[in-house]
Amino acid sequence: MPITPATSTHSSSNGTAEAILLELVDENGTTIGTAEKLAAHQPPGQLHRAFSVFLFDEQGRLLLQQRALGKYHSPGVWSNTCCGHPYPGEAPFAAAARRTHEELGVSPSLLAEAGTVRYNHPDPDSGLVEQEFNHLFVGLVQSPLRPDAEEIGDTAFVTAAELAERHAKDPFSSWFMTVLDAARPAVRELTGPSAGW
């Protein structure tokens, strides 16, 4: 399994576990340091850099993922196509493309920046806090998915109407609507007015 900011530790060359570091930022998104991943999510949370990806098929349907049950943060809930944290110093675009491939086994046929959003979302189930400066990306996926079962429990392509129905009955990540709403202008530009986003 590739070692990425989605995993909590990895083995160094001497066989010891190394913590995954996140990039801490100020309110303007300027890097101010690093923090261990779990520590950055402990209350009250530390503002750190993140990314969220929204991929659509050729019919304008959004690809959702259900987070794997084994994940320590927000397991089993539905969320956007891919989300995560760049390595310190890694460009958010590169991290978004890398993690999308690692989690879904596919590279977007198009990936474009869609702005940023800053939020603070406590997760009542885990007690963790998402205090993020999030870089948003929208794009297209045209290849068959090959999800990593350690990261993803299920996937679904949904229309805007189907998303509204699913969101009313199924659990979603605490950050999902915040990042989707912030990305909507770019989503509408990508999918066109008839898709209903």
Curated annotation (Swiss-Prot):
Q: Which UniProt keywords apply?
A: Cytoplasm, Isomerase, Isoprene biosynthesis, Magnesium, Manganese, Metal-binding
- Gene encoding it? idi
Instruction: Report the function annotation for this chain.
Output: Catalyzes the 1,3-allylic rearrangement of the homoallylic substrate isopentenyl (IPP) to its highly electrophilic allylic isomer, dimethylallyl diphosphate (DMAPP).
**Residues that hold Mn(2+) according to the record:** H41, H48, H85, E130, E132
Give the top-level enzyme category.
isomerase
Q: Indicate the secretion signal residues.
A: none
- What GO biological process terms does the UniProt entry carry, in alphabetical order? dimethylallyl diphosphate biosynthetic process; isopentenyl diphosphate biosynthetic process
Cell location: Cytoplasm
Q: Does the keyword Disulfide bond apply?
A: no
Protein name (record)? Isopentenyl-diphosphate Delta-isomerase
Quote the pathway field. Isoprenoid biosynthesis; dimethylallyl diphosphate biosynthesis; dimethylallyl diphosphate from isopentenyl diphosphate: step 1/1
Record's SUPFAM superfamilies?
A: Nudix
Catalyzes what? isopentenyl diphosphate = dimethylallyl diphosphate
Please give the InterPro entries that the UniProt record associates with this protein.
Idi_bact (IPR056375), IsopentenylPP_isomerase_typ1 (IPR011876), NUDIX_hydrolase-like_dom_sf (IPR015797), NUDIX_hydrolase_dom (IPR000086)
State the superkingdom.
Answer: Bacteria
| Manner of cofactor binding, per the entry note | Binds 1 Mg(2+) ion per subunit. The magnesium ion binds only when substrate is bound.
Species name: Streptomyces avermitilis (strain ATCC 31267 / DSM 46492 / JCM 5070 / NBRC 14893 / NCIMB 12804 / NRRL 8165 / MA-4680)
Q: What is its cofactor?
A: Mg(2+); Mn(2+)
Family under the similarity heading = Belongs to the IPP isomerase type 1 family.
Residue ranges of coiled coil:
none
